[in-house]
């Protein structure tokens, strides 16, 4: 029965296997045989399942494997063909684009490195890449053309396509048709002459005046302009890398010791660098094209000087960049740096605008502190609001770039700023206060460019005007000592003297009491008032000097003392209040039970006496006296404690209340100090203390 049941499922499984459906097998009953009544252990079912499953797997493999193998082989062949066609097409495209047959620059050397430790290249697509040419004899960076090698300055799209294998999708299409520059003509070795297909530097091309820049839309808004025509050669060093050296010179124009605007590494012969006065403002060109405009990234050199980020720098006309010649002038215009050069100007005439990031010399780590400043070249018309990290909101006219007269600069700073230039043996330092206006004249160093010169031996002056009322002069020398500028004369700091309305009177200058033997205006003696005069009519057995008691008038009618005896017997509290002084002792005195009802003058004297004697010695005396009292009270309670009529809490409470009661009956000046006095007091007051303890025992005992 079981075998027939499983055999019934075989044809269905066979049909599924013949149909070639992968993953379709036998039924659940066939795959998972379970024992039944005839086959309790499932041995027969397992044997049948193993035999059947082996046949099915063999049939499936035989039908599927050939198809899978053929499919994989076809895909590999197709993929290989596509890769071959793609590689061939890309190589042909590169050859057609470069216009030469030979070693491909993108395959030999994908990136043109300008310097070993400097990288001016950014990612392709968004940020513009500065035009750089390396004219050294490197095989990967040269282009073979007509028997001689030429090299052209790559634009942003071409440079990104050479380095990354693809051109920028947003690039300018006109730049692709622009002619390339012949490198051999610049070196004087071009043999083709006018028939050369490459553009010579002296020739004029119609497509050279166009501007190519940042098409990726960066936030800085900086552009890179194409070099225009010029009849003279560009500035070159011994290696021939003209644009590279110009770029490095402009990068180091601001920051290298701030003495001149020349790069300290460039020490070669100087050639005249031609540049027109045109500049680019807000995406439009002026009448004259600009010869060299290079983008400045953020560069950090060894002297840790901040450079401008994303601003435009242009060169003036007939300017020479060397260590001994004329110096240039930097201006901020429309968010761009304008680079002006005049031969007759000296380093002191150079006008260097305030950078966006400056050092804060007040901090030891010399981090760059951004700040907001308002700079106005013309206080009546033109003003520019510079943000903390760059950018401009207004454009200034071109006439402010070439002015050599006095330029008025007003500052409204939000924080204290300062300069400190490193790398000199003489350094100048100054502080600019808030709301400080400065005026710099021609021939003097402006206020915000107090930088030292090696050959400077005279003083430079700058005038301050704070609030338009007071004026002072700042003299800055080139010595090694720092000079700090202060706006106006500072008034000395005066401490406010607090004057009280009531004159101060010492605590010991109290008025003399009536009956006192001390002269007037004498210091108060606490010992005089520590003992009150007796107010009882007669106490023959007590001395006057040892009595310090006062009985109020409202209680005199009940207990009237006559001739040392009482009409009525004293209460228990009154008996306890009487101390050993009642027997003629000179150490203690008798006080009444209602001592709190004394006159105000006596009470004040007692309080003052207690405050003056509340010191460490008094505390020690109290502790000794309390210790002896506690021991005496414990001896009195001990027989009752042994009988078992007192609990532990009741014993502690009786001892505590008894000692507190005795202490409350004594004044601080009546406390026995020595052990002999303490023993005498306890012996004399033993009956009173015993009665007090007995009263507390009767109250708290448990019968």
Curated annotation (Swiss-Prot):
Biased composition (Polar residues): 149-169
Alphabetized UniProt keyword annotations: DNA-binding, Metal-binding, Zinc, Zinc-finger
Coiled-coil segments: none
MF-aspect GO terms: DNA binding; zinc ion binding
A Pfam family reported for this protein in Swiss-Prot or TrEMBL: zf-CCCH_4
Keyword Lipoprotein: no
Low complexity composition bias: residue spans: 9-25, 470-481
Zinc finger (C3H1-type) in chain: 176-203
Gene3D superfamilies: Zinc finger, CCCH-type
Region (Disordered): 1-42, 112-176, 204-242, 442-481
Disulphide bridges, residue numbers: none
Basic and acidic residues bias spans: 112-125, 451-468
Keyword Acetylation annotated: no
Protein name in the entry: Zinc finger CCCH domain-containing protein 36
Lineage per the UniProt record: Eukaryota, Viridiplantae, Streptophyta, Embryophyta, Tracheophyta
């Amino acid at each position: 029965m079981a075998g027939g049941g499983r055999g019934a499922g075989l044809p269905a499984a066979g049909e599924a296997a013949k149909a070639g459906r992968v993953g379709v097998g036998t039924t659940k009953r066939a795959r998972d045989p379970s024992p039944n009544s005839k086959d309790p252990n499932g041995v027969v079912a397992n044997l049948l399942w193993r035999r059947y499953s082996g046949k099915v797997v063999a049939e499936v493999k035989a039908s599927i494997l050939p198809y899978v193998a053929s499919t994989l082989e076809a895909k590999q062949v197709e993929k290989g063909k596509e890769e071959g066609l793609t590689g061939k097409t890309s190589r042909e495209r590169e050859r057609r684009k470069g216009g030469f047959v030979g070693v491909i620059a993108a395959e030999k050397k994908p990136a043109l490195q300008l310097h070993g430790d400097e990288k001016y290249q950014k990612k392709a697509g968004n940020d513009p890449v500065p035009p750089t040419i390396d004219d050294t004899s490197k095989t990967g960076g040269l282009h073979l053309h007509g028997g001689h090698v030429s090299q052209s300055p790559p634009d942003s799209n071409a440079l990104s396509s050479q380095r990354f294998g693809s051109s920028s999708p947003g690039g300018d299409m006109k730049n692709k048709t622009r002619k390339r520059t012949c490198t051999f003509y610049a070196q004087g070795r071009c043999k083709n002459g006018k028939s050369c297909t490459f553009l010579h530097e002296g020739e004029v091309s119609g497509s050279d005046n166009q501007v190519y820049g940042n098409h990726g839309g960066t936030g800085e808004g900086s552009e890179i302009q194409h070099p225009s025509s010029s009849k003279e050669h560009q500035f070159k060093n011994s290696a021939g890398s003209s644009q590279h050296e110009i770029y490095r010179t402009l990068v180091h124009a601001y920051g290298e010791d701030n003495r001149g605007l020349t790069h300290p590494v460039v020490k070669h012969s100087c050639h005249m660098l031609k540049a027109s006065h045109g500049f680019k403002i807000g995406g439009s060109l002026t009448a004259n094209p600009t010869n060299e405009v290079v983008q400045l990234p953020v560069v950090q050199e060894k002297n840790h000087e901040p450079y401008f980020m994303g601003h435009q720098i242009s060169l003036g006309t007939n300017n020479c960049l060397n260590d001994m010649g004329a110096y240039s002038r930097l201006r901020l215009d429309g968010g761009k740096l304008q680079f002006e050069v005049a031969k007759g100007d000296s380093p002191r005439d150079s006008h260097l605008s305030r950078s966006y990031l400056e050092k804060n010399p007040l901090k030891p780590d010399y981090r760059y502190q951004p700040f907001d400043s308002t700079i106005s070249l013309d206080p009546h018309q033109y003003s520019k609001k510079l943000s903390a990290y760059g950018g401009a909101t207004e454009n200034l006219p071109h006439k402010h770039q070439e002015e050599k007269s006095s330029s008025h600069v007003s500052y409204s700073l939000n924080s204290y700023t300062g300069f400190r230039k490193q790398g000199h043996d003489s350094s100048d330092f100054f502080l600019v206060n808030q709301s400080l206006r400065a005026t710099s004249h021609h021939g003097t160093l402006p206020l915000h460019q107090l930088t030292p010169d090696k050959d400077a031996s005279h003083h430079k002056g700058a005038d301050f005007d704070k609030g338009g009322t007071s004026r002072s002069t700042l003299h800055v020398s080139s010595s090694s000592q720092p000079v700090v500028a202060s706006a106006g004369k500072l008034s000395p700091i005066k401490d406010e003297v607090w004057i009280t309305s009531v004159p101060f009177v010492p605590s010991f200058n109290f008025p003399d009491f009536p009956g006192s033997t001390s002269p007037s205006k004498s210091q108060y003696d606490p010992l005089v008032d520590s003992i009150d005069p007796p107010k009882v009519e007669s106490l023959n057995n007590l001395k006057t000097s040892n009595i310090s008691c006062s009985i109020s008038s409202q209680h005199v009618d009940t207990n009237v003392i006559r001739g040392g005896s009482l009409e009525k017997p004293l209460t228990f509290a009154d008996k306890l209040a009487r101390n050993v002084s009642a027997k003629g002792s000179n150490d203690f005195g008798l006080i009444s039970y209602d001592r709190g009802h004394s006159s105000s003058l006596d009470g004040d004297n007692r309080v003052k006496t207690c405050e003056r004697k509340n010191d460490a010695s008094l505390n020690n005396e109290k502790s000794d006296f309390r210790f002896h009292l506690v021991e005496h009270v414990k001896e009195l309670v001990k027989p009752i404690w042994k009988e078992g009529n007192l609990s532990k809490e009741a014993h502690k409470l009786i001892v505590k209340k008894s000692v507190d009661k005795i202490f409350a009956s004594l004044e601080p000046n009546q406390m026995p100090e020595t052990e002999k006095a303490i023993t005498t007091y306890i012996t004399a007051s033993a009956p009173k203390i015993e009665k007090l303890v007995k009263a507390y025992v009767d109250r708290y005992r448990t019968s």
